[in-house]
Amino acid sequence: METLEAIAKRTSTRKFKETQISEDNLQEILKAGMSAPVGSGLYESLHITIVQNQNIFSKINAAVTELIFKMMGKKMDKNFGAPTMIFVSSKPAMMPGLEYANTACVLENMAIAATSLGIGNVIWGGAASAVEQNAELRKILEIPEGYKPILCISLGYSSKDEVPKKHEITVNKII
């Protein structure tokens, strides 16, 4: 699949099959993430954690459910049944917000690579926020001291055919 086609086809998958992605595909997705632009080239300010363990998913789901209930007053299951999750954590950046931009670039590259490989994906922040606020999960996921989980991506094969939505963003062109 060509790059622009993968970008156009990428959509958020919210229901996955149990089938695990291959190690080769996982490595390709990681390579794409590590090829992302990072402010000032500070790649060492980022850390990637891969989770493929159902027991840990249960703990993450419980923490996410608790966090969402606190924030929104309702229960939601947010793992989407994905067999792989990748968390990207960051040290605080020198410029405000740069850690969020860096993380987003890494995960968008991963999402486009996954789409090109026929792997469904969704980038989301709830699990990263839940891990950030849970010392036990931070320890289980071996998040290094001084790093904060920013976002994660769930990966797997979609349980249904995904049709990308058309999105519009207001554009001003100044000449």
Regions from the PLM with identified roles:
Residues 1-82, 175:
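N-terminal amphipathic, basic helical "cap/leader" segment at the start of enzyme domains
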Residues 5-6, 12-13, 148-175:
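C-terminal helix-cap and adjacent tail motif
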Residues 33, 86, 92-138:
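Small-aliphatic-rich amphipathic alpha-helix that forms the alpha element of a beta-alpha
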Residues 50-54, 90, 157:
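A general secondary-structure junction signal
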Residues 65-66, 102-104, 139, 169-170:
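Short, solvent-exposed amphipathic alpha-helical segments in soluble enzyme
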Residues 84, 117, 149-151:
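Generic beta-strand structural signal
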Residues 137-148:
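Short, electropositive alpha-helical surface patch
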